[in-house]
């Protein structure tokens, strides 16, 4: 259950309706063909958890999200633009008009036709923007943008952004006839929405939070000039464009300066757009500690922990929990572990690498190929070093939060070696609930390194020899040093929790509102 006890809304924003926009929402629906019943399940991920806390705390907040196909589209069609009240405290359910729930979330679903959504999400948002922003393209061969890609941008990405903007504008006008409201947009799916909303509702307070890395101008030159200009101009419709790190915020301003020719103020971290000033800010996202602990100490988690203890005995646990996304750098992680075991045979039988991996986007060829590489890499390590009594890699392709939190509690080293990562909440989750003074082996390219790097063993994501050495340092670190590092890292995460992440954003918008 998300902790919705967010810091109070600043007085300057009291009475202003709040509209949130994200691609995924807090709940999704399925149709059970056997019973004929409609079932609902909670949305997953750090963004959904964070926004659930905010939406549940604000009585007048409405969360706008996409319904593209299946039962979600059926629910959206039945709602016909009406706001649904959804109780998320137990099994998600839509409340009647007079139904009572504990802090229900108000939801508005945007119907996006399946063909539009496929072009928007399956051609532009993921294979193009995600790859560009994580610098995953092999530029010798990809991307190779043809007329189909251009059509996908115009008829898919632009159209989906228009539909989302129309829903946001309709909600603003319904809740605030004077057009004064707070609109908080999220992530790479909706870069064009800010300017579209600004054109229709010039008096709204608009923020856009980008949850993935923002590279510099050279990376954005992968997009043709008119496409990258649409992206940047869409974001500049907002009052605040926010990122996880100062580095990403500066990179955004450099893009605005070099690709649009606008004058930026790097000291004030802002750019003037006509009569408006647009601010670039860094707000590192965090976790809902209470919700995490609720899962970590559940009956299911306790059973998983007992099973892990029985499996491991006295062995140390090296852990990673990731999606099978190429940006997570999983194959290099196995290569580094292989080198570690080759150079340090004394570790044989003394460590197990549990890799909990959730298969991701298997309809994208690069992702399907990467999952096959992962399986081959894990099998190779086991074949080279395993014995009848000990398998060095325990590969589990599943998503199980109870098991993940049990592994967080039991692990000795957590491996995060991403080539690019906006934040990486796994690092923060593990630090908070771990019971063995774990060592965080953390990529310098993960946003979490800005907060936790001082207490971690830093990894270079492309240097597997360095990663092997770092893993050895982590596994053999002095117990007292482990204890001190872990204690301080946990304090940082508990202090900078999701409530603080939300409150600093609202405080910034409140200051802008007062200055108008």
Q: Where are the predicted features?
A:
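Catalytic cores of carbohydrate-active enzymes across secretory and cytosolic contexts
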Residues: 2-516
């Amino acid at each position: 259950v998300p902790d919705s006890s967010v810091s109070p809304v600043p007085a300057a924003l009291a009475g202003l309706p709040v509209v949130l926009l994200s691609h995924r929402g807090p709940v999704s629906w399925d149709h059970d063909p056997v019973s004929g019943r409609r079932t609902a399940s909670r949305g997953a991920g750090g963004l959904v958890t964070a926004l659930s806390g905010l939406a549940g705390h604000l009585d007048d907040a409405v969360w706008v999200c996409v319904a593209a196909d299946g039962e979600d589209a059926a629910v959206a069609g039945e709602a016909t633009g009406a706001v649904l009240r959804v109780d998320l405290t137990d099994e998600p359910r839509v409340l009647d008009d007079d139904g009572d729930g504990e802090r229900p979330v108000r939801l508005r679903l945007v119907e996006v036709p399946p063909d539009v959504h496929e072009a928007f999400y399956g051609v532009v948002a993921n294979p193009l923007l995600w790859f560009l922003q994580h610098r995953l393209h092999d530029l010798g061969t990809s991307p190779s943008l043809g007329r189909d890609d251009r059509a996908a941008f115009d008829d898919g990405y632009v159209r989906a952004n228009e539909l989302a903007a129309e829903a946001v504008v309709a909600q603003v006008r319904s809740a605030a006839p004077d057009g004064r409201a707070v609109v908080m947009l999220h992530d790479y799916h909706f870069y064009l929405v800010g300017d579209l909303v600004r054109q229709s509702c010039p008096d709204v307070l608009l923020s856009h939070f980008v949850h993935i890395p923002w590279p510099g101008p050279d990376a954005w030159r992968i997009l043709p000039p008119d496409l990258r200009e649409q992206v940047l101009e869409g974001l500049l419709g907002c009052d605040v464009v926010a990122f996880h790190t100062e580095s990403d915020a500066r990179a955004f301003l450099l893009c605005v300066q070099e690709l649009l020719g606008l004058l930026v103020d790097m000291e004030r971290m802002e750019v003037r757009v006509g009569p408006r000033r647009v601010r670039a800010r860094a707000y590192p996202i965090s976790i809902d500690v209470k919700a995490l602990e609720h899962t970590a100490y559940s009956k299911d988690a306790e059973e998983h922990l007992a099973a892990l203890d029985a499996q491991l005995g006295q062995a140390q646990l090296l852990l990673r929990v990731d999606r099978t996304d190429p940006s997570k750098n999983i194959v290099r992680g196995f290569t580094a572990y292989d080198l570690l075991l080759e150079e340090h045979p004394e570790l044989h039988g003394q460590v197990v690498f549990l890799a909990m991996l959730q298969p991701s986007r298997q309809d994208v060829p690069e992702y399907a190929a990467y999952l096959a590489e992962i399986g081959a890499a894990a099998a190779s390590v086991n074949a080279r070093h395993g014995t009848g009594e000990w398998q060095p890699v325990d590969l589990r392709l599943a998503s199980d939060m109870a098991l993940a939190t049990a592994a967080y509690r039991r692990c000795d080293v957590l491996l995060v070696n991403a080539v690019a990562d906006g934040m990486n909440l796994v690092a923060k989750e593990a630090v908070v609930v771990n019971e063995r003074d774990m060592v965080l082996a953390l990529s310098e390219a993960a946003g979490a390194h800005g907060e936790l790097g001082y207490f971690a063993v830093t990894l270079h994501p492309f240097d597997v020899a360095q990663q092997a050495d770092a893993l050895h340092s982590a596994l053999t670190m002095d117990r007292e040093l482990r204890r001190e590092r872990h204690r301080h890292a946990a304090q940082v995460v508990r202090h900078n929790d999701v409530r603080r992440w939300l409150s600093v954003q609202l405080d910034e918008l409140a200051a802008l509102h007062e200055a108008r």
